[in-house]
């Protein structure tokens, strides 16, 4: 997983940088090695915004969180991405289960017809 950190209209310290990277590295288990992650830090009118975008072949997951504390924004964006990943994973599992059932029903029907002939 490749990481890119973007700072808009502000500078972040090393503690925040390592905190964000450590949190985002936990998402590494959900994605393949060729995925790109962009973490954007920005500040507007006293509000701290963190935007995290993970790009992988066939999938883009994006989350943005705005609070008064940058660390809380990182935590909120990470939890939002984890929620999206769980939702996507559940959707894929349901699709695979439904497809598997249809294939089994077709095979069983074909076997039943052959037995009667």
Regions found by a protein language model. Give the residues of each.
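N-terminal, polar/charged subdomain of small-to-medium soluble alpha/beta proteins
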Residues: 1-117
């Amino acid at each position: 997983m490749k990481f890119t950190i973007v700072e808009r209209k502000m500078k972040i310290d090393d503690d925040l940088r390592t905190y964000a990277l450590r949190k985002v590295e936990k998402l590494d288990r959900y994605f393949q090695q060729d995925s790109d992650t962009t973490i954007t830090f920005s500040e507007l009118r006293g509000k701290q915004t963190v935007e995290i975008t993970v790009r992988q072949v066939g999938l883009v997951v994006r989350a943005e969180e705005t609070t008064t504390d940058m660390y809380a924004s990182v935590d909120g964006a990470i939890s939002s991405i984890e929620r999206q990943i769980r939702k996507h994973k559940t959707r894929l599992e349901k699709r695979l289960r439904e497809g598997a059932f249809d294939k089994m029903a077709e095979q069983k029907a074909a076997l039943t017809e052959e037995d009667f002939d």
